[in-house]
């Protein structure tokens, strides 16, 4: 994402002690530094985004819709739009953060393309998914109430065309405690290597712990199968971050 906005700022939101941290919010301050924050916090993020573009080239079909659910600043939307060769398609990018939506629209408008994009400020749980050849949940599901996750995946499955794909990227938890601890610590090392201090890491973690509730790969796969997807697999992973593909059967 960092190549989309030459004016993006370095993330120093948590560099000094904050008395009342509260819960994490995707507000104006976060939106302003988001490209830098996500590059330095999520291992493999830029790879996932560029490969989402490659997947769009394979899966997006003519006369269909593409959904980017929890689009933030539109990195996945732009990657998909650059790679879509099918005609008469539309991308619907949704986020519930006004600050993200405003900036996302500016990013989208900065690039010309044959494929129209509609950026909507809304709760993704209220979006009607229809005639979709591709749906992206890029580090979004983990911020939903766990009770709402299965229902959303069910609606995505129902709204996908046969042969359509869901890309689900998440931070993972692990049933094996030793593996979980190792990957947690390696992610900590990753952030430290990217210039974050112990104070920044701990303050951000405190704000996220009540808001971002992660699942294991096994839980994700189980939910996706329960929704109706027959073809489900992890296609990318770096430490405790990764992405799954769920493909709706061509004859379903």
Swiss-Prot record:
Keyword Transferase: yes
Catalytic reaction(s) noted: prephenate + S-adenosyl-L-methionine = carboxy-S-adenosyl-L-methionine + 3-phenylpyruvate + H2O
Gene3D superfamilies named among the record's database cross-references: Vaccinia Virus protein VP39 (3.40.50.150)
Enzyme class (EC, first level): transferase
CDD domains noted in UniProt: AdoMet_MTases (cd02440)
Pfam (any one): Methyltransf_25
Enzyme Commission number: 2.1.3.-
InterPro entries hit by this protein: CmoA (IPR005271), Methyltransf_25 (IPR041698), SAM-dependent_MTases_sf (IPR029063)
Keywords per UniProt: S-adenosyl-L-methionine, Transferase
Binding site for S-adenosyl-L-methionine: 45, 70-72, 95-96, 123-124, 138, 205
One MF annotation (Gene Ontology) recorded for this entry: carboxyl- or carbamoyltransferase activity
Alphabetized PANTHER family for the sequence: CARBOXY-S-ADENOSYL-L-METHIONINE SYNTHASE (PTHR43861:SF2), TRANS-ACONITATE 2-METHYLTRANSFERASE-RELATED (PTHR43861)
HAMAP family: Cx_SAM_synthase (MF_01589)
Function: Catalyzes the conversion of S-adenosyl-L-methionine (SAM) to carboxy-S-adenosyl-L-methionine (Cx-SAM).
Record family assignment: Belongs to the class I-like SAM-binding methyltransferase superfamily. Cx-SAM synthase family.
Complex formation: Homodimer.
Name under which the protein is recorded: Carboxy-S-adenosyl-L-methionine synthase
Biological source species: Photorhabdus laumondii subsp. laumondii (strain DSM 15139 / CIP 105565 / TT01) (Photorhabdus luminescens subsp. laumondii)
Name of the encoding gene: cmoA
